[in-house]
Amino acid sequence: MIEKFLELGVVKFGIFRLSSGLESPFYIDLRNVLGEPELLRWVIEQYREILLRLKFDIIVGVATGGIPYASILGYTLGKPISYVRPEAKEHGTGRLIEGAEVSGREVVVIDDVLTTGKSIIGAINAIRSAGGIVAGAVVFLDREQCGSRNIKTATGVEVYSVYKMRGLLDRLKDYIDEEQYRSVINYLAQWRC
């Protein structure tokens, strides 16, 4: 299944500016998985295997990348779902968290890709401000750029990942050229976490 990530442009090589402001020789776009039901089922199953080991009452997606995965996982596991906006609405209810009530409940946070951890830290803080208890965070891919450490340091919350970038790269090694592989390995070497 993993080779389909290249075919569908889920993993891209080049020079990319990330939402964190960092420049990267690779880009991960898990939104492309949403248009491929077979691959989507596989990705959901990978998340599910981690979630089955955790104790939680509610699944909360991080906007925007985590929302579709949180929604499908909530439906699949029979758990209520919510999502955290990047900032509160200025109209309507003005809520930061939409969906099921998090107050007094054990929450697992879902996102697609982890870089610096800023989005997940923001979501954890919002959930705690609303009275939720954060049991953990799960991402499909940890880019290995100190995000897990940043989250643990800032919030005490453990992050679980389906893949770490080096592991994904090793799985893709037979499908990419040596220059692409080396470029990513050299880039990741600068992150000492």
Swiss-Prot record:
Enzyme class: transferase
Sites where the protein binds orotate: 115, 143
Catalyzed reaction equations: orotidine 5'-phosphate + diphosphate = orotate + 5-phospho-alpha-D-ribose 1-diphosphate
Record-listed E.C. numbers: 2.4.2.10
Keywords: Glycosyltransferase, Magnesium, Pyrimidine biosynthesis, Transferase
UniProt-listed Pfam families: Pribosyltran
Domain of life: Archaea
Cofactor(s), names only, from the UniProt record: Mg(2+)
InterPro entries (alphabetical): OPRT (IPR023031), Or_phspho_trans_dom (IPR004467), PRibTrfase_dom (IPR000836), PRTase-like (IPR029057)
Listed NCBIfam families: pyrE (TIGR00336)
Oligomeric form and interacting partners: Homodimer.
Family: Belongs to the purine/pyrimidine phosphoribosyltransferase family. PyrE subfamily.
Function: Catalyzes the transfer of a ribosyl phosphate group from 5-phosphoribose 1-diphosphate to orotate, leading to the formation of orotidine monophosphate (OMP).
The protein, known as: Orotate phosphoribosyltransferase
Organism listed in the record: Pyrobaculum islandicum (strain DSM 4184 / JCM 9189 / GEO3)
Name of the coding gene: pyrE
